């Protein structure tokens, strides 16, 4: 990891790059800060498909079974994922497939997974067969991607962005991102108290120690140790979504061939004086003896006999082998030897008893200290392992279904059999396309949906925030408790306190800070135990110089290494930290070193914990004692003293210092100018609104075929911006416009956050934008089974004359209106032509048309991709916002001649109502207005990084002096003249330059009007929904408004006459709406004879009356009658 990247942060923003001589020429290298934003995604995927795939192959056990009395064994030897390419039989100059082609053709960017499968009969190897297991989705810009390592110039040649970041998958032409999810910290025993544990069985208490055990290839399993009210401990684990319980004594006895006394001595370490605990340990060992399990072999046979029915192992496995399988796959699976598992279970038992007796505190499972992140590579690898195991099972089932023919198995027959195995392609595409996990084991996860989201390219800021977002999990969204949503102090510097949505996902969907990274590499730690012992740590089976109660247990990645004395521990920590920072003794730079001290009262369970595992969050700070930068973790940070400013540093107390005062903000939050002068909710709103801005999301519009893209036609570089704006080169993808804003209540059209825009500014293109919509037209789907259908029109067809070209497609640049011919196709066999007409109400311009071929590049072209451009000038009702959460809608386009003007004759672009400031307290916007004004007068670009100004160094003084030097008022006000009367306004008006954003919420997308139209078939009421031209909902609030205005009879028209008025017949005597029916005519009646309506209950017709009722009421009465409930009407 490069720790020097934050040293060269630009401090003074500049506009020089806007007038560079070499503008438009691609740079030699991509911007490192922009590429770092997706590093967690790409690094984890690279790790998964290289080293991780090898580990998966090693970890998958052989599939062994009986066939015709022979023992068949199938196992993977090697697996490799190739780079994306077309099949060799196709017509193409280059076999490589690039992401732009997959987006255009709406297909998946994928590559072939090939495995070497070894098979043997009765233990005799029969050879290795190379087998394709399917097509795997490939992450863009990863090592397997064809874009990997390309320069910006080469990326442009392949129709990508010069700053293409990657980090996503392309499934059916749509860019999908695997979400970063919060998971419990791996291989760390957490003390939890949950009342629902009591319902697990008789004697269970709420106390437990929970551990999420994770192997090197990321296979995870959750294991609990439960405390029972009789003082014994029960081990609980999940295997194939089933819950199993095992008394602790059996687990310990099965792991090591120790005597009961040796096990007893290990368990009571540090608690030798606690007689209750010693009696509990004796009782747990006595339970094992009562079952006749006196030795390790007997315990293994005992467990294997009881568990083998659930393990699905070959019938020739002995009970002992079954028990070993159980211990390997279900107990502390992150540890490789049984002795390590034994020591870890003993440590967890000691912690459980300390917790049950209130000697240590409960650990908050919602605290970031005990969290890590589920990365895309981790999920990809876990899912791949399960599906490869499933492939072996499918081959076994295919062999068992094979008819019992004479003759044995041959390499040819096995190859045919392997081809019948389950293909992995659909499973992976389903996972990425829907985000739903179809798994038999659950992969140790808390949710099986919402794992993937679309990488929405609404603008650059929204796009990058997808890769920095960390979600707590779908399971917590349904909880009524608010504890999971709270911002805890431990998250300082790792999770942004500002960048979280308001509303339902608040506090659950968080974003990593700009300095936060996720550890991806897996580093060998085999040398660390020896290093620890050389520093003064005693081995787990050794004897320290002091009593165990005066020592700390040392845990490295969930393995008990040994014990360290209290007095020696601080020096061990200091030495390890020095090795870590200086890169000595093979200590990884991302190692987390945590010493939880003994406090003499109930606190966290003391110990020396070392973490080198991947998927943890780390960030960069400055180590004051060594004068270098250091990566620290969340758990580690709690026990460090980190200062922010120089004046806060105390010698001997402060150990580290923040690199910048704004280190605790996310990338998006750092784009807010002067955010330290705003109220915090306004900064939260701005983080959301900057992701809804109509901006410039990409440069390759002509090569894209997204369903919908927005484009701001007149973007500008902000005159006032934080340092991070230039650090991430946001000027390449601008999101707004500098506007002259006057704070004045000039008309009545700017109340309640509305704003007035100068009509002449609007005519000059202020905030003008357009929407690009793409439609895929596939003739093979429209007319299935007919290969003679192609695009085209009949020559001389008057319907399409001048509208469609000879190929049946519209002209590039032509305007399409409702009812215009859109495209035509013709049958080469019959000569019959069809024309499809444009069905949308909004007119558009045909921007470009792409012709798509099939996989092999053969056959007639039947698939096109039409991109149309819809111009969107701002209209009344469109939403705008400043960068300070001050959102409002355009209420009126005011003529320039009626706008107020300054002494120099300048008219503002926007009139902002001054009532928007007092309650919102967005002082940052006032400062930006003054700063923007001084920047435009002096030709400068001001730094708006938060915490730059303070009470000693006032922003008002700084920008006021600049305004004064330019000949303007110190406080940013000016004398304005009325545009109506020409007279000078009495008050001084605050006027300046503010960067405004146009949001994507436009009236053109939302307005809805209807007179008559579609009705619901069941209720006969007008249908809802804009797409079906449905009615507008008339709800309770609208009803109350009419009542409050004293126009209650209008409700009769709105809710009855214009809704579902119908005529019904009711019996006056019995009040029934259902019983009046037309009498059934006898056969000899003529068709013209009048039939009477008779009540079936009263058997007479003179009591029938016609009434007007809502149709839905008739439906409701019929539904109640079906439930044997009678409705009686009182008709007068």
UniProtKB/Swiss-Prot annotation:
InterPro entries (alphabetical): DNA-dir_RNA_pol_su2, DNA-dir_RNAP_su2_dom, DNA-dir_RNAP_su2_hyb_sf, RNA_pol_bsu_CS, RNA_pol_bsu_protrusion, RNA_pol_Rpb2_2, RNA_pol_Rpb2_2_sf, RNA_pol_Rpb2_3
CDD domains: RNA_pol_B_RPB2 (cd00653)
Catalytic activity: RNA(n) + a ribonucleoside 5'-triphosphate = RNA(n+1) + diphosphate
GO biological process, one term: DNA-templated transcription
Loss of function: phenotype: Knockdown of the gene by morpholino antisense oligomer reduces neural crest cell migration and causes severe craniofacial defects.
Main location: nucleus
Keywords: Chromosome, DNA-directed RNA polymerase, Metal-binding, Nucleotidyltransferase, Nucleus, Phosphoprotein, Transcription, Transferase, Zinc, Zinc-finger
Annotated Gene Ontology cellular component terms: chromosome; DNA-directed RNA polymerase complex; mitochondrion; nucleolus
Subcellular location, record wording: Nucleus, Nucleolus; Chromosome
UniProt function note: DNA-dependent RNA polymerase catalyzes the transcription of DNA into RNA using the four ribonucleoside triphosphates as substrates. Second largest core component of RNA polymerase I which synthesizes ribosomal RNA precursors. Proposed to contribute to the polymerase catalytic activity and forms the polymerase active center together with the largest subunit. Pol I is composed of mobile elements and RPA2 is part of the core element with the central large cleft and probably a clamp element that moves to open and close the cleft.
Record-stated family: Belongs to the RNA polymerase beta chain family.
Oligomeric and partner information: Component of the RNA polymerase I (Pol I) complex consisting of at least 13 subunits.
Protein name: DNA-directed RNA polymerase I subunit RPA2
Native organism: Danio rerio
Name of the gene: polr1b
